[in-house]
Amino acid sequence: MAKKVVAVIKLAITAGKANPSPPIGPALGQHGVNIMAFCKEYNAKTADQAGTVVPVEISVYEDRSFTFVLKTPPAAVLIKKAAGVESGSSEPNRTKVGSITQAQLQEIAQTKMPDLNANNIEAAMKIVAGTARNMGITISD
């Protein structure tokens, strides 16, 4: 018989930098998960993506064991990296802070594809373009 899931915890953690301090410790501790075991596993799986924020979805079972699924980095993080800016615009409709090319947009959409609710790459590109627009980043041809 399958184990019963008692909680699903969603966290956004910098790759390779999971440690038992807040916010990770308290989020896992209240469900009785072995925090160090999670941190070691997460850091091992994300070692190749160092410096990027990698969201994770942790399923905690009734016997306090856990499994986790790594998601793709947030579109905003990928867009900021591609545009070479620190943060998005505070007034995206008035002031633009940077721009990305159509090729960069397609690359980001390709990366995000598994986590997006899109059937093809064009739809994924539109979703990512909308995120970029809301950050004050223009898309050039």
UniProtKB/Swiss-Prot annotation:
GO molecular-function terms, A-Z: large ribosomal subunit rRNA binding; structural constituent of ribosome
InterPro entries reported in the protein's UniProt record: Ribosomal_uL11, Ribosomal_uL11_bac-typ, Ribosomal_uL11_C, Ribosomal_uL11_C_sf, Ribosomal_uL11_CS, Ribosomal_uL11_N, Ribosomal_uL11_N_sf
A GO BP entry: translation
Keyword Flavoprotein: no
Keyword rRNA-binding appears in the UniProt entry: yes
Gene3D superfamilies tied to this protein: Ribosomal protein L11, C-terminal domain, Ribosomal protein L11/L12, N-terminal domain
Cellular component terms (Gene Ontology): cytosolic large ribosomal subunit
Post-translational modification: One or more lysine residues are methylated.
Top-level taxonomic group: Bacteria
Keyword line: Methylation, Ribonucleoprotein, Ribosomal protein, RNA-binding, rRNA-binding
Complexes and interactors: Part of the ribosomal stalk of the 50S ribosomal subunit. Interacts with L10 and the large rRNA to form the base of the stalk. L10 forms an elongated spine to which L12 dimers bind in a sequential fashion forming a multimeric L10(L12)X complex.
Chain's role: Forms part of the ribosomal stalk which helps the ribosome interact with GTP-bound translation factors.
Family to which the UniProt record says this protein belongs: Belongs to the universal ribosomal protein uL11 family.
Record-given protein name: Large ribosomal subunit protein uL11
Upper lineage: Bacteria, Bacillati, Cyanobacteriota, Cyanophyceae, Oscillatoriophycideae
Gene: rplK
